[in-house]
């Protein structure tokens, strides 16, 4: 055995299982295969048992759940892609690592977890979506997409050639899987590996792989019971958002109907440009497969002249059909990676983690997208398998958060958790030994306003029964004055701001400052804000104290 690895292992037996310490382990440290999708909702994984997934199963992800532990209460600290990735890389909350919003850059002076894994003797790699405003740090190997990346024939850059992107022919999920396998094929066999496989899918606008286009045509997915939510009994944020399927999903871009282009309308032109950003990359064969399904479907839609609730239901059905068709490729990828591990005798000593950067709305409250502290976007799927160390087919309902992922990686590597990380390693839960001091509540904070979807800034605290949310901040153009990054010419956020102004997207948003309180036991769908109602004084006081404790402890300076 390599002497460096031996030196790292010998002290482990002396370490306790308390927060920040490594659990005693067997002689060899495990490999880590971390698979993360973008916007994969729990509702879209059949192991979680939702009505949608019963009609569109995910057998390979389910197989992973059968081999390990499925977490039902995994939450994010900021339900937005790049901030979630920054949290994964640093183990820090958004305000601590600098990546509070999409356009802000992570503080690169912070230590990245892969750097610590490297120092501990791991070979590190990342393939697929990086989407951070910096070079990958701490990776021996990277093969990453250009920004958000495209589904069809995307651009990648490779180790030592950061920023020099080259187009590759194929589908993003398939290519990402292939590059993951290339890493595994060429890794140093005398080292444990830590590989991050980050899929673009199923991010908006849901372009399926050619073989899966239209695979759910004719399948009628059940409407969520809150689909027709009118947002009564809640504050203004739920009403002023721009993520409603009926009103805000774009027929041209999201539903892929270029025939509806209106060259006199700026929104129509922008939507068409977004669609052509994918269609224009397709090969003749890919476009033929796409046209075969979408052209007749679009013709039927235009002829039907739907409106009102009929149009809303059509949008919902086709949104879910496209989304789940994209998930089919992700599920196949998980199966291919699991099969590879088994075929190469790596399955017994590899921790496999499956998750998403955050949750997603699949029609609940009539919505798509994420951002809110409400349950569907606050939750994220988490499944962990480690044969012989984690019991098979078990479920966990303890409260875990994505700030726990970094400490978990480090614990497996035998690296002491840095003091600035406030998350907890998951090993005790995975072993069935919940510590007495395990968290009883958690803190959440969303910062990215004003931008697309117009979800207002808010933070909050959630425990096993109640949730307290505080919405705050200036509205509309008054908020722009506080976001200097949005006014830098040439940046994507500047272009976004120009577009939003041109379409009067947020010119009438009011300033807000109010609380919402939900009893998740009696109101799991969060339809009734009980803040200020008689009988809630005690729980409100308790949650307000916890919220202020978090703000003080974490040094939140937003207010």
What function would you assign to each model-found segment?
Residues 2-5, 13, 20-497, 503-516, ...:
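Formylglycine-dependent sulfatase
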Residues 8:
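Acidic, histidine-bearing metal-coordination/catalytic regions of metal-dependent phosphoesterases
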Residues 521:
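Residues forming the ATP-binding cleft of Hanks-type serine/threonine protein kinase domains
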């Amino acid at each position: 055995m390599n002497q460096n690895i031996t030196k790292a292992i010998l002290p482990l037996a002396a370490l306790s299982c308390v927060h920040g310490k490594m659990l005693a382990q067997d002689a060899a440290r495990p490999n880590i295969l971390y698979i993360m999708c973008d916007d994969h909702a729990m509702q879209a994984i059949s192991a979680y048992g939702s009505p949608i997934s019963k009609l569109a199963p995910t057998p390979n992800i389910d197989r992973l759940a059968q081999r390990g532990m499925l977490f039902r209460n995994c939450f994010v600290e900021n339900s937005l892609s790049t901030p979630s990735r920054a949290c994964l890389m640093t183990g820090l909350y958004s305000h601590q690592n600098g990546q509070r919003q999409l356009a802000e850059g992570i503080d690169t002076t912070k230590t990245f977890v892969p750097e610590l894994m490297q120092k501990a003797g791991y070979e590190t790699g990342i393939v697929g979506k990086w989407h951070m405003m910096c070079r990958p740090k701490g990776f021996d190997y990277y093969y990453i997409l250009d920004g958000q990346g495209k589904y069809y024939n995307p651009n990648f850059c490779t180790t030592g050639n950061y920023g020099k992107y080259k187009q590759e022919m194929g589908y993003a999920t398939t290519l990402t899987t292939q590059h993951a396998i290339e890493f595994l094929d060429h890794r140093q066999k005398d080292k444990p590996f830590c590989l991050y496989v980050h899929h673009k899918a199923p991010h908006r606008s849901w372009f399926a792989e050619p073989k899966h286009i239209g695979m759910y045509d004719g399948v009628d997915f059940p409407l969520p019971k809150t689909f027709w939510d009118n947002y009564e009994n809640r504050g203004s944020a739920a009403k002023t958002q721009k993520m409603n399927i009926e009103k805000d999903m774009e027929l041209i871009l999201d539903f892929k109907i270029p025939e509806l282009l209106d060259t006199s309308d700026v929104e129509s032109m922008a939507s068409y440009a977004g669609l052509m950003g994918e269609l224009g990359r397709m090969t003749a064969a890919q476009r033929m497969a796409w046209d075969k399904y979408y052209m007749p479907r679009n013709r039927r839609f235009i002829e039907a002249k739907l409106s009102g609730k009929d149009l809303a239901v059509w949008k919902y059905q086709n949104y879910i059909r496209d989304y789940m068709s994209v998930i089919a490729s992700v599920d196949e990828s998980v199966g291919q990676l699991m099969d590879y591990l088994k075929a190469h005798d790596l399955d017994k000593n590899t921790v496999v983690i499956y998750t998403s950067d955050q949750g997603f709305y699949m029609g609940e409250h009539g919505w798509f997208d994420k951002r809110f502290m409400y349950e569907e976007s606050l939750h994220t799927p988490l499944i962990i398998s480690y044969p012989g160390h984690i019991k098979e087919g078990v479920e966990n309902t303890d409260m875990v958060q994505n700030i726990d992922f970094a400490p978990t990686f480090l614990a497996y590597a035998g690296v002491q958790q840095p003091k600035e990380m406030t998350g907890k390693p998951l090993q005790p839960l995975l072993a069935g030994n919940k510590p007495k001091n395990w968290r009883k509540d958690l803190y959440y904070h969303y910062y990215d306003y004003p931008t697309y979807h117009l979800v207002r800034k808010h933070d909050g605290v959630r425990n096993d029964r109640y949730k307290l949310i505080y919405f705050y901040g200036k509205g509309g153009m008054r908020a722009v004055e506080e976001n200097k990054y949005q006014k830098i010419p040439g940046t994507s956020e500047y272009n976004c701001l120009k577009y939003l102004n041109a379409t009067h997207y947020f010119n009438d948003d009011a300033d807000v400052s109010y609380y919402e309180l939900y009893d998740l036991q009696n109101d799991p769908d969060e339809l009734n804000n009980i803040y200020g109602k008689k009988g809630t004084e005690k729980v409100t006081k308790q949650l307000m104290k916890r919220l202020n404790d978090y703000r003080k402890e974490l040094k939140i300076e937003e207010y």
